[in-house]
Amino acid sequence: AGLAYSVIKNALLKVIKLTDPKDLGKQVVVQGGTFYNDAVLRSFERISGCEAIRPDIAGIMGAFGAALIAKDRYTGQKSTMLSFKEINELRFKTSMTRCQGCINHCLLTVNEFTGDRKFISGNRCEKGLGLEKNKEQIPNLFEYKNERVFRHYKPLKKADAPRGVVGIPRVLNMYENYPFWFTFFTKLGYSVKLSPVSSRKIYELGIESIPSESECYPAKLAHGHVTWLIRQGLEYIFYPCIPYERVEVPDAGNHYNCPIVTSYGENIKNNIEELRDDKIKYQNPFISLESEEILTKRLVDFFRKENGIPAAEIKAAAHEGWLEMQAVREDMTKKGKEVLQYLKETGRHGIVLAGRPYHSDPEINHGIPDLITSYGVAVLTEDSISELSEVDRPTIVMDQWMYHSRLYKAASFVAKNDNLDLIQLNSFGCGLD
């Protein structure tokens, strides 16, 4: 019964995203093989409060629909579909393999037919088909964002870092704030060691310390990233808790981070045994990025006490970090404008692939940006266009999460441009999702 309920709730609340299932009406015709299950059918009726009408052909109504469309669109041309005789004579063999083109390692199904014909499925981009990835150079701002936020920065050599090495995990809020922290620590004389791009192996490194299976996958990955830093022999790891992001939309209700981003550094400290070793200095201070003034004051209080760094140095480093964080936002907006101009000049279409900052992680987005560009469609991020539009306020939701305030602005922009559509990525469907 619980499984049947979860199937319906997931479909109505997470996929269709209904506010109230009872809005469907009093009588609903259902289709699809899933509704052959009486428990699922009854769960639908209980949750929606309607009378569900299940035709005898519910499981094949989609096939009937496709046949009717084909009939309507028939133009009198001979079909390329094989004849019954050719189908009976058809011989093929199927094998499975893993694509080695990128970290997604897609599971490919290779069907080999007579006449040296081959059909491959399961791939998320051209690489699985043996083709050149993004041959037409379709803009993909997920690639640019990863370059600008992470690969753009080159750490100091150890010999040039008088205060040593600090490890920073490539997780959660770091997909938004890493430019600040890299600049801040570099200006203070630290060499910044960033954990690698997420992968299944990184996840498995930290699997023993994950306290709950109900956490979102991006949070679970954090355990592997911190464990990786520990195994590199680092003696200093910094992973702050950020309850408040910077004020990006002044007239929004607030600018919180989600509860996971707010405090996950604390969760890591309490669940990874190696961090109980006095040999590792692990810092996870609660810090607000609300404004440069508030942030700087907190950093001075913390680093002067914990690391013995003079206030003047901390203030100077914080200012440089703040400027760099602003520069990244400006660069993203500039790149967004360039892609919009490209779409205008070429007549192509664009998808705003909107989500949280960590959705630029290929392990978390599962290669969806590459899949979209393989169809000749440009990919933009929500933060590349959010500054180009405003939201009519008050909103019908309580607008108090900073990332979502950005999503609303991006969605408002998309609604006004016919050459754009928006797809929202979410890894858990929590909170305002």
Residue map of PLM features:
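An N-terminal assembly and electron-transfer interface module characteristic of large anaerobic redox
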Residues: 56-57, 74-433
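Glycine-rich phosphate-binding loops at beta-strand->alpha-helix junctions
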Residues: 6, 19-45, 58-59, 173-175, ...
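Active-site nucleophile and cofactor-binding loops and adjacent substrate-binding regions
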Residues: 2-5, 29-34, 53-63, 196, ...
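Oxyanion-binding/catalytic loops of NTP- or PPi-dependent enzymes
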Residues: 38-43, 52-53, 110
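Conserved helix-loop functional segments at active or binding sites
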Residues: 13-21, 50
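Extended, hydrophobic alpha-helical segments in both membrane/secreted and soluble proteins
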Residues: 11, 24, 30, 40, ...
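Adenine-nucleotide phosphate-binding core of ATP-dependent small-molecule kinases
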Residues: 1-13
